[in-house]
Amino acid sequence: AGGTSGLYAFPRV
């Protein structure tokens, strides 16, 4: 999964 969530952002794995 990936995208933005609240104050966190992460790459799509």
Curated annotation (Swiss-Prot):
Its main location: secreted. Dorsal ganglionic sheath of fused ventral nerve cord. It comes from the Eukaryota. One of its GO terms (cellular component) is extracellular region. The modification Valine amide is found at V13. Pfam families: Periviscerokin. Belongs to the periviscerokinin family. This is Periviscerokinin-1. It comes from Musca domestica.
